[in-house]
Amino acid sequence: AGYVAVKKKELYQNNSCRLPLKHIPGEAQVDFGQADFYENGVLHHGFYLNLSFPYSNVGYTQLFKGENQECLFQGLKNIFEHIGGVPYKLWFDNASNIVKLLRNGERKLTDAFLRFKQHYGFEAVFCNPNAGHEKGNVENKVGYHRRNFLVPPPQFEKLEDFNVKLLRL
């Protein structure tokens, strides 16, 4: 083998630089997924909010016709009421309906999200742009919820009633 190949092997043979993932109880991650569903026989291309607790791997989901601020707030409110509390820290993507990325790299929360956050008393943490792996637990939960609850597309009469059912699953 050539000099470069030998040096690469030397340099990289014992490369065990990893940070262990340790999650503290009470931290949660939030993300949306896409799913089709039938309400009163009408097909909708909707979205489902996912909240997962990495420490315990428990997750909750709520289905909506949109992926806007109102859906985020309603879904989180439903989940908080169901679990009887609020996580002390929530991890989010940099969704434009809750945060603006400023030129200097800082973030500015939207007024409505700031009020929602203050009302429920949680700390909001935002992932770095293009770093979905920073909240990998909820990314996995998005797939789990889709495979187990939303495929084939569910059929129901009232979305609100189906969301109550989803909280009990």
What annotation goes with each model-predicted range?
Residues 5-59, 67-74:
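Mobile-element integrase/transposase regions
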Residues 33, 54-56, 64-67, 92-97, ...:
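An acidic- and aromatic-residue-enriched active-site/binding cleft used to recognize and process polar
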Residues 54, 79-88, 119-122:
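Secondary-structure transition/capping motifs at alpha-helix termini
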Residues 57-62, 151:
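Short small-residue beta-strand/loop micro-motif enriched in glycine and branched aliphatics
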Residues 62-86:
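Active-site beta-loop-alpha junctions of metal-dependent nucleic acid enzymes
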Residues 85-105:
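Acidic/histidine-rich, metal-coordinating catalytic segments
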Residues 106-124:
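Two-metal-ion acidic nuclease core segments, chiefly of the RNase H-like superfamily
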Residues 121-169:
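Charged alpha-helix within mobile-element recombinases
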